[in-house]
């Protein structure tokens, strides 16, 4: 998903939640873009842990969250293990095959496009609408189902 959309969601939720940005070493630049947007929006209650945690530390951090917003990822499944309310954003991947298992507090946000799921990291149609069309308000609407 796009850093500006993650940042918009985080900024909106920062009045109720402390924000934690997770990511692997390959996602540090994206996390830094999110952090920069949060700073510009005046959000101060956040931590950027991208590229800074071991797997056990990541598990420990996720296990203590009140809410987790993520793409289709390994950490999404960690959150399911701990029954963390999760909003999972799906684009090119197949939510029927890879969404959370056994988490009753899970919401999937996706667009229903003919080209989904293509299972490609790079859009074969060159538009990546499956991710571009998911906007912050879609995710925030899903978060409200937990309240």
Give residue spans per PLM region.
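Donor-binding and catalytic core of enzymes assembling or modifying cell-surface/extracellular glycoconjugates
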Residues: 2-91
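Nucleotide-sugar donor-binding patch of glycosyltransferase catalytic domains
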Residues: 35, 45-49, 80-147
């Amino acid at each position: 998903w796009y850093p500006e959309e993650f940042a918009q969601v985080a900024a909106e939720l920062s009045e109720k939640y402390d924000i934690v940005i997770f990511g692997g070493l390959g996602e540090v630049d994206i996390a830094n873009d999110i952090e920069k947007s949060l700073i510009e929006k005046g959000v101060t209650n956040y931590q950027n842990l991208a590229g800074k945690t071991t797997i056990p530390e990541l598990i420990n951090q996720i296990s203590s969250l009140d809410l987790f917003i993520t793409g289709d990822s390994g950490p999404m499944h960690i959150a399911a293990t701990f029954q963390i309310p999760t909003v999972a954003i799906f684009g090119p991947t197949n939510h029927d095959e890879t969404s959370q298992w056994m988490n009753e507090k899970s919401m999937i946000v996706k667009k229903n496009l003919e080209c989904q799921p293509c299972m490609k990291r790079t859009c074969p149609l060159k538009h990546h609408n499956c991710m571009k069309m998911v906007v912050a308000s879609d995710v925030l609407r899903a978060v409200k189902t937990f309240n």
